[in-house]
């Protein structure tokens, strides 16, 4: 189940936790983050490739492409047996910003976005069917867990794709990892 947990940037206390999709979308919208639920136009097999995935979500993908003028769209898939999973996970674990907004749609599996806005950190557990759009220059990080298992559609307005500017902050080390965060809910 998708979930929003809102912590103070000093995570000593208990977070506010929201699991209703509409409430999650409303709360995230209040900080400029788009969050919505999509449904596939057809059933996908577990080994569906990029073309099959994009075809299943064609109407939603086309709507976003028209609205934002994305220059490229691709599908990334990461499984627990991927030989580079630790290196790929490490790439996203430190707080960073982008000069462009970051849009991800979860076709399968789950991942955890951490959005550092003001004196709060919003942990957004995204699962199958969730679309999240993180505004440009929003400090954030992402954790896929030690055994990642997800498939995402990624949208880019620039041809060079994902380019991060790391903030140098160690704030990410003070918050639960993906695996720690989902453990109580599993």
Regions found by a protein language model. Name each.
Residues 1-70:
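N-terminal leader/capping segments at the start of a protein or of a new domain
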Residues 74-99:
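Conserved short histidine dyad/triad with adjacent acidic residue
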Residues 126-146:
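Conserved metal-binding segment of the jelly-roll/cupin
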Residues 97-117:
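Short, conserved beta-strand element in jelly-roll/cupin
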Residues 143-186:
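Double-stranded beta-helix
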Residues 85, 113-115, 122:
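Short, solvent-exposed loop/turn segments at secondary-structure junctions
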Residues 37, 74-77, 154:
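Structural signal for conserved beta-strand scaffold positions within catalytic alpha/beta enzyme cores
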């Amino acid at each position: 189940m998708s979930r929003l947990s809102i912590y103070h940037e000093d995570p000593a206390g208990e977070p506010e936790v929201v699991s209703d999709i509409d409430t999650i979308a409303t709360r995230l919208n209040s900080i400029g983050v788009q969050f919505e639920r999509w449904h596939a136009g057809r059933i996908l097999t577990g080994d569906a490739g990029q073309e099959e995935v994009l075809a299943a979500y064609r109407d939603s993908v086309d709507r976003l492409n028209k609205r934002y003028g994305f220059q490229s769209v691709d599908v990334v898939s990461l499984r627990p047996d991927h030989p580079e999973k630790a290196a790929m996970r490490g790439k996203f674990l430190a707080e960073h910003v982008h000069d462009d907004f970051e849009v991800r749609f979860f076709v399968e599996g789950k991942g955890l976005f951490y959005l550092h806005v003001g004196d709060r950190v919003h942990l957004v557990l995204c699962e199958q069917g969730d679309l999240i759009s993180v505004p440009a220059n929003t400090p954030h990080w992402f954790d896929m867990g030690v055994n990642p298992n997800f498939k995402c559609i990624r949208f880019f307005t620039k041809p060079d794709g994902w380019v991060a500017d790391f903030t140098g902050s160690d704030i990410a080390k003070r918050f639960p990892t993906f695996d720690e965060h989902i453990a109580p809910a599993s």
